[in-house]
Amino acid sequence: MLDPRARTLLKTLIERYIADGQPVGSRTLSRYSGLELSPATIRNVMSDLEELGLVSSPHTSAGRVPTPRGYRLFVDTMLTVETPIDAAAVARQVQSTLQAGEPQQKVVAAAASVLSNLSQFAGVVLTPRRSHVFKQIEFMRLSEKRILLIIVTPEGDVQNRMLATPRDYSPSQLTEASNYINAHFAGLSFDEVRRRLRDEIDQLRGDMTALMHAAVTASTEVPDTEDTVLISGERNLLEVADLSSDMARLRKLFDVFDQKTGLLQLLDVSSHAQGVQIFIGGESTLVPIEEMSVVTAPYEVNGKIVGTLGVIGPTRMAYNRVIPIVDITARLLSLTLSQQ
């Protein structure tokens, strides 16, 4: 537990390091902390903070820099998100980018782009998982014995399947089959539809039953779409010296983007929590680079969490600026998708 004096000095040190990117010495702390302390007293406090693992001393400087543990204490207990940016302006920019009525994938990709543009780092979005449940289906005759099955999920996602049938069906027969399925089975999983069709087979004409079974089989034969991670603005991170000045670190950074497995795991963890979360490199095992942090928030469709979005940037980022960008974008993406 830090005393108020140590907390003030640590907070000042981290704020100055975020602003300037240079190790912070006792003279700078004296100037910006608002505390009337001698340089010797400040150095003693810094030594205590170093022993606690909250700051460290680069070999080339007399000043100190925050450690991952110091950043964690800062964002958890000292950070005041006073939104130095214009929150209303951010909301307007996000809203102008996220257009209701656009295909879901396009809206989600736009969210990654707006996160990158506003933060000047990389924006990332875990796209919604495809639903095992359908809201509506439709059959469309393409040619003799070839039918297009159109599936609409509760999230508004549209999936298409091609059906090859042993016989031809008229448009009226296809309408009859889709109306029956929509009236009796909408909101159920296709496994449940298959089970119920088996129970109701005596009530249906044989040719309709065959078509419905073909539709259910086609819907479940295709493997579930893998969770997709969309990234925008990776090149922005080339301008961040903390991440790009070392070639090995830069290679590791782009391995993160190429592999996406670690990002997928991190975003999945975030989707099980409410509100904004901050993952700090060197402190979180989910972030493989000590100089990198990820700020995330889940987003919803009709009150149900379906994915996560966030900003990838340096550990030395202005958290009080990035957090509201992520929070506002998540809220407005949720609103846009729920209006689909």
Swiss-Prot record:
The UniProt keywords, alphabetically, are: Repressor, Stress response, Transcription, Transcription regulation
Q: Name one Pfam family in it.
A: HrcA_DNA-bdg
Please provide the Gene Ontology terms (biological process) for this protein: negative regulation of DNA-templated transcription
User: A single Gene Ontology molecular function, please?
Assistant: DNA binding
What function is annotated for this protein? Negative regulator of class I heat shock genes (grpE-dnaK-dnaJ and groELS operons). Prevents heat-shock induction of these operons.
Q: Which HAMAP family match?
A: HrcA
Q: Please state which protein family the record places this protein in.
A: Belongs to the HrcA family.
This chain belongs to which protein, by name? Heat-inducible transcription repressor HrcA
Species this protein is from: Burkholderia multivorans (strain ATCC 17616 / 249)
Biological classification of the source: Bacteria, Pseudomonadati, Pseudomonadota, Betaproteobacteria, Burkholderiales
